[in-house]
UniProtKB/Swiss-Prot annotation:
CDD domains: OphMA_like (cd19916). Pathway: Secondary metabolite biosynthesis. It comes from Coprinopsis marcescibilis. Within the homodimer, the clasp domain wraps around the adjacent subunit to position the core peptide into the other subunit's active site for iterative intermolecular methylation. This is Methyltransferase/ribosomally synthesized type I borosin cyclic peptide precursor cmaMA.
Length: 391
């Protein structure tokens, strides 16, 4: 059922609180929390919990639904149903879950699926995950050679394929094979950890690097970024360092015989096919940051002028202010969705092309009206050139 077609009175919005306490909350998430009838949350720290309660007094902590006497999957069913019951009562419900609310989170997907099928409006807004933090702290770009992400137990149970020519990120390496819940896990209880290491050794060998990563939560903390070889993780003194919130990152093997250029395809794109496959700089000691090509283009900066196709942002744009309001005020956004033209007509300080763009809501018109010249812009070109630049 289309959740946007004549939805019932209740609605569900799922947002993420991110990993870092308070700092990762998006402006959009905060706006949703402030205007909700009921806020249900499962967050990882007390400071974020206090921040949420400060923004809305009608808050319910779903964490007490966990129990050491039942499986986590049972708790997830209950969490989803708890939120759905408030939606069915006609309330505007916001669910806040730590990290990205759709990454390794079960109750959020379940609640949204059921709500939509029952005719309620239900949406999920993105948040920062542990993997996003990992990319930033370790300097990893997943687009360079691709990235595979697995939950550790799932990878072992289903014998998921590994590709040593790409990045590998493994979640929940500290609770391999655990389906139960405990408020405090002991690293010594990670009895199946050795099976994970055996699988990695089979693919990568004992000397390949593994980065043990934990993203910081409080502003007083620093990220954990410990480097081991796969063989070293067989030692108890190292395996005991792995916590429930630990993530593993394995860099690709370089060079890899599994990677080869599709030169015929490159020629069809009029791209030179003489370059070797690119490997991430931190893991390729032969990659020179200031080679001949880099030096040449850096020198060209001195004489660079903006190209004819570049269009600067309009000064004192009324449309920019209107879009800021729609981004931060959920009630204003609801009014725009109810009657786009009427809302656009009610906004003062807009030019004709800005008003038309606001009423249309289309990306090309909005982007064009925000820039000098007012010509619609197509963002697809930017995506294409970004992809090609990574070859």
């Amino acid at each position: 059922m289309d959740a946007t077609a004549n939805p019932k009175a209740g609605q569900l919005t799922i947002v993420g609180s991110g990993i870092a306490s308070i700092n990762h909350m998006t402006l959009q998430a905060v706006a949703c929390i402030e205007t909700a009838d009921v806020v249900c949350y499962v967050v990882a720290d007390g400071a974020t919990e206090a921040f949420i309660r400060k923004k809305n007094e009608n808050c319910i902590d779903l964490y007490p639904l966990y129990s050491e006497t039942k499986e986590r999957t049972d708790t997830y069913i209950q969490m989803a149903e708890f939120m759905l019951n408030h939606v069915r009562a006609g309330k505007n419900v916001v669910g806040v879950f730590y990290g990205h609310p759709g990454v390794f989170v079960c109750p959020t997907h379940r609640a949204i699926y059921i709500a939509r099928n029952e005719g309620y409006r239900a949406v999920m807004l993105p948040g920062l995950s542990a993997e996003d933090c990992l990319y930033a702290d370790l300097g990893i770009d997943p687009s360079t050679v691709g990235c595979i992400t697995y939950e550790a137990t799932d990878m072992l149970v289903y014998n998921r394929p590994l590709n040593s020519s790409s990045h590998l990120v493994l979640y929940q390496v500290g609770i391999v094979g655990k389906a139960d819940f405990k408020f405090a896990y002991d690293p010594k209880e990670n009895h199946h950890f050795g099976k994970l290491i055996d699988r990695l050794e089979l693919e990568y060998g004992p000397d390949h690097t593994v980065v043990h990563y934990i993203a910081p939560i409080f502003p007083t903390e620093e990220p954990v970024m410990e480097r081991f070889t796969i063989g070293q993780l067989k030692l108890k003194e190292n395996s005991d360092k792995i916590a429930t919130i630990s993530t593993f990152y394995l860099p690709p093997k370089a060079p890899s015989a599994k990677v080869s250029l599709n030169r015929e395809f490159l020629r069809s794109l009029n791209i030179a096919d003489s370059r070797d496959p690119m490997t991430p700089f931190p893991w390729n000691p032969t990659a020179a940051p200031y080679g001949e090509r880099e030096k040449k283009v850096i020198l060209e900066l001195e004489s660079h002028v903006p190209p004819p196709g570049y269009r600067p942002l309009k000064k004192n744009s009324g449309l920019a202010q209107a879009l800021e309001k729609l981004s931060l005020d959920t009630r204003a956004l609801a009014a725009w969705k109810t009657d786009r033209k009427a809302y656009a007509d009610s906004v003062s300080g807009l030019t004709d092309d800005e008003r038309d763009a606001l009423a249309s809501g289309k990306h090309a018109q909005l982007s064009g009206a925000l820039k000098e010249g007012g010509v619609p812009m197509n963002h697809a070109q930017l995506t294409f050139f970004f992809i090609i630049s990574n070859l």
